[in-house]
Amino acid sequence: MAQRIPQEVIEEVRHRTNIVDIIGQYVQLKKSGKNYMGLCPFHEERSPSFSVAEDKQIFHCFGCGKGGTVFNFLQEIEGISFPESVKRVADLEHLSVDFDWSEPREVADTPENQQRRSLLQLHSKAAELYHHILVNTKIGEPALNYLLERGLTQELIETFQIGFAPQKRDFLSQVFKNEQLDETLFEPSGLFVQRDNGTFLDRFYQRIMFPINDPQGNVIAFSGRLLKTADFPGDEMPKYLNSPETTLFNKRETLFNFDRARKEIRKENTVLLFEGFMDVIAAWQSGVKSGVASMGTSLTNEQIRRLERVAKEVVICYDGDNAGVQATNRAIQLLQENSHFDLSIVSIPEKLDPDEYVRKYGAEAFQNLANHGRETVFSFKMNYHRLTRNMNNEKEQLDYVNELLRELTNVQSPLERDRYLNQIAQEFQLSVHSLEEQFNQLKQEQRSVQRQERQQFYQDEMMPPPMEEPVFEENHVQNKLPLTQVQKAERSLLFRLMNEQGVRQTIQQLPDFSFAHDEYQELYFLLESYATLHQSFDIADFINFLQDNQTKQLAIEIAYQNLSEESSEREVADLLHVIALSSIAEAIEQKKIQQQEAKRVGNQQLEAELTMEIIQLARQLKAQRTFT
């Protein structure tokens, strides 16, 4: 099997792709002369400096300097490897990149791709039919009137391709049969339910239909809202019914409206997170077009990872009732534990949901609330912790204050902490000094617990009992120097990368990460190259994939480590922290060497600049160690 995509294949894919069409899915482009201009997605700017040359099929930002081909753009914006970017472009152009081939082939050549494309066509036809029924037929009039009464416009219904599934249970199946569509696709599509006699009934009936799209805008599933009428009360039916999971649709990875909102999210570096589809649509109609919603379930790590590729800030805008407040608190906890997002909250007043708020107060009021009514996580927590306490009781007041001080240990900004300490002191007639003492005590306890956990971690994970070294070749040196703490951390992290896809995804989202030692960095590059060629990671196969004997031996030693079967998020964070400290220390040493050379040749300006850089790095190193 070839180990990389042949150059002629790369060129063929590029020649059959228009870079403007691809980049236009991420950046709003406007024609300017012979090129297209837009706001750069890689740095903040107010005037466009990002240029796409259609004739040359390249892009360049005159502000930050980034540029390249369509593959380089996707590598940068989606955080993927070069082979993955080639495959990504090929998918968008309906070509399949196979590492064994020498010419591009149409997606239909493989059974899996053929079925996927056929299922996408089936969903597209269903969406078109449902939409036609809603806007053009008498059967759809009650549903259309309901939506118009809810404040939706015809334009909005078109934008979201909202439709209606009639009450007749075999409506869609009969239409598809009349069109002689492949009935073997009915069951895996999720659009139908098969009866005992082998015939098919429509899964969705008497429902307003919301198409659910993948990031490229293809319909992959539906969510149907029950439409109750006098002759169809539907009392025992669920209000919302979603498609089951299929080869197209994984609800843990899917976000409603992500395909439409992505450009705006990229532009603002911010995403608004809603609970329901109607909330997203109402926000869109109000001019807030960076909203998405999870699929009727709590937010998932897979959805968080998708959002991390396009945004730096998440604004949680859930319902204002008690259930919505509880869901907001859970989302905060999940996001704080599994991401590095800046978080803020929009609390909807009067226990309304966003859709109700828009209908009651109008689009302008909601837009103002969404843009200017955001509160910090701590401000939300202040209100949240009141819900379960009797604030007229002195003991519960003190418990409340202690709970807030614990929450305050998660606030990094000194200004924000100072403001809230003064606010708490004023409300409960306490001295700021006493609150600071209590806060510092809690902070010290927190650091002590973290330090103990890290020490236990290194005892349990970083220093496993000695094992017999596998013999690989005759000149293998048995008496090696003891590994340093950094080397142990690097080996443990590589072990996790070999065994856990989630850890690989985490590292891929850290563009500035690198191993401290070249041999481990090289192995990591080879590991990533292997992963792009294989759907699953097999240690033995990976060893065979490696060409250099020393690298193979290193991989074997790492694979033989006696570590737990599954890592924790804390373990991975600790490993990254140890490696990062080493990288800073190494950078300081390199700067010192450069400084001595500048001094030797009499370059005083460079010497002074390097001195300042060394000071900054030393402060950074000290801060990191203090945090530890």
Curated annotation (Swiss-Prot):
Cofactor: Zn(2+); Mg(2+)
Keyword Ligase part of the UniProt annotation: no
Renumbered zinc finger spans (CHC2-type): 40-64
Catalyzed reactions: ssDNA + n NTP = ssDNA/pppN(pN)n-1 hybrid + (n-1) diphosphate
GO cellular component, one term: DNA-directed RNA polymerase complex
A GO BP entry: DNA replication, synthesis of primer
Its EC number(s): 2.7.7.101
One of the Pfam families matching this protein, by short name: DnaB_bind
Keyword annotations: DNA replication, DNA-binding, DNA-directed RNA polymerase, Magnesium, Metal-binding, Nucleotidyltransferase, Primosome, Transcription, Transferase, Zinc, Zinc-finger
Class of enzymatic activity (EC top level): transferase
Positions contributing to Mg(2+) 2 binding: 319, 321
Domain Toprim intervals: 269-351
Cofactor binding comment, as recorded: Binds 1 zinc ion per monomer. Binds two Mg(2+) per subunit.
Entry-linked InterPro entries: DNA_helicase_N/primase_C (IPR016136), DNA_primase_core_N_sf (IPR037068), DNA_primase_DnaB-bd (IPR019475), DNA_primase_DnaG (IPR006295), DNA_primase_Znf_CHC2 (IPR036977), DnaG_bac (IPR030846), DNAG_N (IPR013264), DnaG_primase (IPR050219)
An example molecular function term from Gene Ontology annotations: DNA-directed RNA polymerase activity
Residues holding Mg(2+) 1: 275, 319
Family classification: Belongs to the DnaG primase family.
Function according to Swiss-Prot or TrEMBL: RNA polymerase that catalyzes the synthesis of short RNA molecules used as primers for DNA polymerase during DNA replication.
Subunit details: Monomer. Interacts with DnaB.
Domain remark text: Contains an N-terminal zinc-binding domain, a central core domain that contains the primase activity, and a C-terminal DnaB-binding domain.
NCBIfam families: dnaG (TIGR01391)
Name of the protein this chain belongs to: DNA primase
